[in-house]
């Protein structure tokens, strides 16, 4: 789940 959250954050940034 950690990598998934990171991906979402990267998309927003």
UniProtKB/Swiss-Prot annotation:
Residues with the Leucine amide modification: 13
Any one biological process term the GO annotation gives: defense response to bacterium
Tissue expression summary: Expressed by the skin glands.
Cellular component terms (Gene Ontology): extracellular region
Assigned keywords, A-Z: Amidation, Amphibian defense peptide, Antibiotic, Antimicrobial, Secreted
Positions in coiled-coil regions: none
Superkingdom field: Eukaryota
The keyword Zinc appears for this protein: no
Cellular localisation: Secreted
Main location: secreted
Family: Belongs to the frog skin active peptide (FSAP) family. Temporin subfamily.
Described purpose of this protein according to its UniProt entry: Antimicrobial peptide.
The protein's name: Temporin-AV
Organism: Rana arvalis (Moor frog)
């Amino acid at each position: 789940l950690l990598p998934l959250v990171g991906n979402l954050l990267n998309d927003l940034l």
